[in-house]
Amino acid sequence: MNKLNEPTPRRNFLTNSVKGTLTLGVGMSTLASLLQSFTFAEDEDSGLLLQGAGAVTTEAQFRAAVAGPVNTSMMSSQLAVAQATNPYAKQFAGFELEETKGMISILKDLGTTPPPPDAKAQAMMTQMKAATGAAFDKAYITAQLQTHQLLQTLTQGYLASPAPAKTNMMEMHGRHIATLALATIKEHVAITQRLSTVVGS
């Protein structure tokens, strides 16, 4: 039996923990306007950079900022589970798909609906759908590396902002979850960096 797409105890724990803590006291927020406050640019060395990441200071802003990249990662991983030919790329896609499904479920429970794919995400998906074999694997891993670099920038920016009062449990829980997420994001950056040297060659 293929166990790539089976949920692991770590993923179940993270999903249930986030839902059980962050749903306390969450109300509707102006997430659409928050999303519009962020713009993206290309950097020659590190790929995607977020302009305005330092403005992410609350858990609501953080949720709004990561929703798009997480959704893009989920869509590309859905495609890669079916089309990837490199076994390591396919395995990574299976793990990433389950993690992003869990995160999207959490975001929706908290009132954060991922925005429609932007022009860059649409172009990436179009490129992937047109590719086959090793070219597809390379396009997928490259996209995953850039997406996780972006998520790392967002998460580190949020955690570097002034800490909330310890009595503000909603914000404290948000930072706890971001801290856990950052470790996984860094792990995925390292994995995709290694994979980028072997896929498509």
What are these regions (language model features)?
Residues 40-201:
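His/Met- and acidic-residue-enriched segments that coordinate or traffic transition-metal cofactors
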